[in-house]
Amino acid sequence: MNKLVKLFTIFISAITLTIASISSSFAKVEGEYIVLGSAISLTGKYSSNGVHTQNGYNMAVDRINKMGGVKVGGKSYKFEIIYYDDESNPKRAAQLAERLIKQDGVHYMLGPYSSGLTKAIAPVTEKYKIPMVEANGASRSLFTKGYKYLFAVLSPANQYLEVAIDLAVEKNGGKPVRIAQAFEQDA
């Protein structure tokens, strides 16, 4: 539970700092709302985790809105999110990111579930200079491309087990430890 609270706090901080750091004149503002966009897997092979990601985004936005929103330029705004189902398809995810930016006019994106889908969307958000807070893409390669508009709340996947392995070695008196890791290569 403590880890969940920590991740939630990091997510809230990242989204608030990202939006607060950019002038509100660039934001799509509907009345007193800043509109965020997200191409996310609601169907297809990533749908289970995509729905969890959407629930997390909704929980964060609901909490921010209940706390009065975010202050930008001395004015408070609440958030609204436009979602499109990327069908767990990278090509579709990139198309929907383009649609959210060009047709819907969003100026802030919330990332999809999966490193592969994030890899498809990141070039689009970079092209249009749209900040994207990424909650679930963790492939190391995402962080070696020099993206200026991609902000992550997780450490890269290659760091997930470092602490656990160090602890296992320590508990084993420094002797070699055998481990196995299974993963999907989707990025």
Predicted region positions:
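Short, low-complexity disordered leader/linker segments with a strong preference
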Residues: 1-35
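Acidic/histidine-rich, surface-exposed loop or edge segments in extracytoplasmic proteins
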Residues: 37-45
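Beta-alpha junction/loop-to-helix N-cap segments that form part of ligand/metal-binding clefts
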Residues: 28-31, 35, 48-55, 67-144, ...
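An alpha-beta-alpha
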Residues: 42, 148-187
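Short, solvent-exposed amphipathic alpha-helices that sit
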Residues: 49-68, 160-163, 187
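Redox-cofactor binding/interface segments in oxidoreductases and associated redox assembly factors
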Residues: 38, 111, 181
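Short amphipathic alpha-helical/adjacent loop interface patches that line ligand
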Residues: 12, 57, 61, 97
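A generic secondary-structure signal
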Residues: 63, 67, 99, 166-171
